[in-house]
Amino acid sequence: MAANKDLNRLKVILVEKKKSNLWLSKELGCSPTTVSKWCTNSSQPPLEMLLKITKLLDVELKDLVRFEELDKQ
């Protein structure tokens, strides 16, 4: 199932941008546990959150989401 795939690169991008899960959770107004699940790809952020994340981290959606993994499903 999709939850087991690495569909997003959020963890990698946070490291590249020198930001923490806690910082992102505060900026988005969601729990640190939720962000942690997104970072480990055990769940995926909804599209609205993905768009907010791209703005906060100054990245493009194509850099955050691994669309090639979606094609394999």
Question: Predicted segments — roles?
Answer:
Residues L64-Q73:
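Short amphipathic recognition helices of helix-turn-helix/homeodomain-type DNA-binding modules
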Residues L14, S25, T54:
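The alpha-helix within a helix-turn-helix
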Residues C30-Q44:
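Recognition helix of helix-turn-helix/homeodomain-like DNA-binding domains
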Residues M1-S20:
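A short, Lys/Arg-rich alpha-helix, primarily the initiator
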Residues W23, T34, D63:
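Residues in the helix-turn-helix
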Residues E48-D63:
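DNA major-groove recognition helix of helix-turn-helix/homeodomain DNA-binding modules
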Residues C39, L57, E68:
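DNA major-groove recognition helix of helix-turn-helix
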